[in-house]
Structure formats: structure tokens, C-alpha cells
Curated annotation (Swiss-Prot):
GO molecular function ontology, one term from the record: ethanolamine ammonia-lyase activity
Pfam families registered for this protein in UniProt: EutC
Cofactor names: adenosylcob(III)alamin
Gene Ontology terms: cellular component: ethanolamine ammonia-lyase complex; ethanolamine degradation polyhedral organelle
Disulphide-bonded residues: none
Reaction it catalyzes: ethanolamine = acetaldehyde + NH4(+)
Pathway assigned to this chain's UniProt record: Amine and polyamine degradation; ethanolamine degradation
Annotated protein name in UniProt: Ethanolamine ammonia-lyase small subunit
UniProt keyword Isomerase present: no
Naturally occurring in which organism (per UniProt): Pseudomonas putida (strain ATCC 700007 / DSM 6899 / JCM 31910 / BCRC 17059 / LMG 24140 / F1)
Amino acid sequence: MDHRTPTPDNPWLALRNLTPARIALGRTGTSLPTGAQLDFQFAHAQARDAVHLAFDHAGLASQLSDRGRESLVLHSAASDRHQYLQRPDLGRRLNEDSITTLRQHAQANPGGVDLAIVVADGLSALAVHRHTLPFLTRFDEQAAADGWTSAPVVLVQQGRVAVADEVGELLGARMTVMLIGERPGLSSPDSLGLYFTYAPKVGLTDAYRNCISNIRLEGLSYGMAAHRLLYLMREACRRQLSGVNLKDEAEVHSLENEDSASQKGNFLLGKE
């Protein structure tokens, strides 16, 4: 401690370089320093903004088209953001116009598909805007050899996880992958979640889904998330199930070298 420091140095201070978690914030008397308090308020504001940010489905559809992917823009039964937040049940189902759109698509393309990819804003459209395309790029690279047929990417406004079950059932999809913005945390306003379901249908519980969470640069890399998803998909096709009876036992032979702020190692073990 010196004349410029009102409190002794925190011995945990060095760990701050190894994790984005709020540790070793310091103190001024019995309170947080001004800088730490302002950082907390800023992170809280970012989380609130992420929840209420509008889903730019048109922009995402255009970007998908530029990469050769068709898309369908649908809407859940929740008419607006306020209703979506107040009525989670409505976010799990499609509205009537969207149901009609999917039925017409299924009639024009009979026989079903192996995979339906659904993208919904969830509680963080920011996560969807930032991470959907990079993840799908890595997924396509790794899945090319499997030869699965897929439906157009379905973009659902005001959607929750279970809406993918209805999408998959209407399209006759053997599997669904839901990409959705996770509830923002105070250090992660842009975390993307992935939910995989085999044999989707309306009414399934979370026990029938597998989750891969925290897909973002500071969390799970796009390539690693795609690797884990493909393991689940291949095992699901072999065993004809998903959820609690299907464990992620994918082997990881090497760490990826992606431009990522996550390459800091485990803060408990230090850098390797």
C-alpha cells in the first residue's frame, strides 16, 4: 500500500487476467471502488439492452442468402416483446400465419428432411446477430461429409426453445437444432445457446433436448460447439434418441487456435 492506494493490494488481483468473472474488485472502506461500481452498472445496462434489442431477421436472412442458404421468417404466438416476456408459453408456439407457411413449404417439398435449423432471438438478439453466421460456417465445414438434407433456416421472432419442436414437426424433420440468445449475464450479454432434439414434436420437455451453451468468443468456440453438436447428431441417429439418455462424450484431440479472448486457460490452474 502507498499514498495513492486507499486499501492494501488484493492478493487475487493477478487472477483477473485469467477470467472475465468479477473477482478482486477491490474496496474503498466497506464499499466497492467507483470504477468497479460503474463497470457493474454498465454491464447491467448492456444486459438490459440485449434483452430488448430488436431481432434483425431481415439482415440475418440477407446474410444467409449471400452464403447460399435459404431462410423462412416466422413469428411465435407472442405478438410483441412485452407479451413475450410476460407469457413464456406463447413464445413456445408459432402463430397461425407461420404454421400455414410451414405447411405450405412441407407440401411443396414432401418427404421431410434430416435437419431443421431454427434461429430465435430468445433473450439476447445480440448473441444471434454476432454468432449465428460464424457458427453455421464452422458447422457446415464439419458436417459436409455426412450428407444430411436440411430445410431452409427458420428465423423465429419472439421465439423460445420449444418452438423448434413445432417447426421440426411441421417440416417433417428428423432432427432440429435451435440457436437462441441466452439470458444475458453481467459479463456475457451475447451468449448463444444451442438446443438439439431428435424426433421433434410439440409437447416434448427439456429432458428430450441436449444443450450446448455459452457459444461466443469468450466462451465455447464455434468450431468446438460444431464438433460437439455433430457428435450428438451422429449418436442420435445411431441410437434414435436425444436428451438425458444421450451424453456428450465427444473426444477433443486438440484445442482450436481461433481468434478468441477465451484462450486464457482455467483461472484456477493458470496458463499452460
